[in-house]
Design a protein with these regions (language model features):
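Active-site-proximal loop/short-helix segments
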Residues: 44-72
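The substrate-binding groove and active-site-proximal loops of carbohydrate-active enzymes
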Residues: 15-29, 65-69
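Short, small-residue-biased leader/transition segments that mark boundaries at the very start
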Residues: 1-3
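Substrate-binding cleft/loops of secretory-pathway carbohydrate-active enzymes
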Residues: 93-125
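Generic structural signal for well-ordered alpha-helices
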Residues: 35-36, 74-82, 132-137
Length: 156
């Protein structure tokens, strides 16, 4: 268990890497500082993956949450990062197709509802036209401005 302000628990399945606590302003600032560092290297776009909570366990302790739900905290973190880099860097948030369509345990809501401007969706296989249209409409209805679909056999 990590006890710093940034990470509160370790992910045994990922070699003991610490998770950053989405409720920690310092953790969100740290991610933003990493994006700023990449921007300073000349990159104009960055893809952020795993902006989520770990799978639930009894050992998790997020510290003070002020009653803010996990989904609302992720929305606030995404909004803070987008605001910080508005007009200077394009941020993409990457989620699986399943996370976009269902309430996953790591998000509590479908990813399309988290308020990102740019969404990269990864699918295990190509989507049929109806499924793609449904995803596009769902994302647009939630304010997603740009949607990119990456599947095993196509990148659109």
């Amino acid at each position: 268990m990590c006890s710093s302000d940034l990470g509160l628990w370790l992910d045994a399945q990922k070699g003991g890497n610490a998770w950053l606590n989405p409720y920690s302003a310092a953790a969100v600032e740290y991610v933003g500082d990493l994006v700023a560092e990449v921007q300073g290297m000349g990159f104009e776009q960055v893809v952020l993956t795993n902006v989520q909570f770990p799978k639930l366990s009894r050992k998790q302790d997020y510290g003070e949450t002020s009653g803010v739900s996990r989904a609302d905290q992720l929305k606030a973190d995404i909004a803070a990062l987008q605001s910080r880099f508005a007009g200077s860097m394009t941020l993409w948030f990457s989620y699986t197709l399943d996370q976009c369509n269902t309430n996953s345990v790591s998000l509590d809501v479908p990813a399309v509802t988290l308020g990102m401007d740019n969404l990269l969706v990864t699918a295990d296989k190509a989507m049929d036209a109806d499924s793609r249209t449904a995803l596009e409409q769902s994302a647009a209805g939630q304010g997603v401005q740009h949607l990119v679909l990456h599947s095993a056999d196509i990148f659109q």
